[in-house]
């Protein structure tokens, strides 16, 4: 892989803050931190394009005592069998459950799945975490 060196002009205060953060996070140098930022920027762009193949997780916390929430959750997951790769179910306490759904597919479709899961009656909190399939990252 060919590496290109380039210069970036930034205010001193911004660079000082950046250097403190990359040291806290354990980066060995600025270049690796900047590469990670560039990769994250590319991944976010992939998600903006609804027809791109992406991956992610949808995490929800719900009250399993809520009428029909478990049934609706299972039905919804079966509606998207091509995009839902797997799921993990955790009993948080006697009433609350955490479900992590691993998804892969077109960005627009993944967002649709997340919106439907998160908006189910009985879901207390939900979050879509987006990432990449890794195919186009170096």
Swiss-Prot record:
Signal peptide: none annotated. This is Putative nickel-responsive regulator. The lineage of its organism: Archaea, Methanobacteriati, Methanobacteriota, Thermococci, Thermococcales. NCBIfam families: PRK00630.1 (NF001884), PRK01002.1 (NF002169), PRK02967.1 (NF002815), PRK04460.1 (NF003381). Keywords: DNA-binding, Metal-binding, Nickel, Transcription, Transcription regulation. One of its GO terms (biological process) is response to nickel cation. It comes from the Archaea. Belongs to the transcriptional regulatory CopG/NikR family. Transcriptional regulator. Ni(2+) binds at residues 78, 89, 91, 97. Binds 1 nickel ion per subunit. One of its GO terms (molecular function) is DNA binding.
């Amino acid at each position: 892989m060919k590496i290109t060196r380039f210069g970036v002009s930034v205010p001193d205060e911004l660079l000082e803050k950046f250097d403190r953060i990359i040291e806290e996070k354990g980066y060995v140098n600025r270049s690796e931190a900047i590469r990670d930022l560039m990769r994250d920027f590319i991944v976010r762009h992939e998600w903006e394009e609804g027809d791109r193949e992406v991956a992610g997780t949808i995490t929800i916390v719900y009250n399993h005592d809520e009428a029909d929430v478990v049934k609706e959750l299972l039905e919804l997951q079966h509606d998207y069998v091509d995009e839902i790769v797997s799921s993990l179910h955790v009993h948080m306490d006697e009433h609350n459950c955490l479900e992590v759904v691993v998804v892969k597919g077109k960005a627009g479709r993944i967002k649709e799945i997340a919106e439907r899961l998160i908006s189910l009656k009985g879901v207390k909190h939900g979050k879509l975490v987006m990432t990449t399939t890794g195919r186009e990252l170096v």
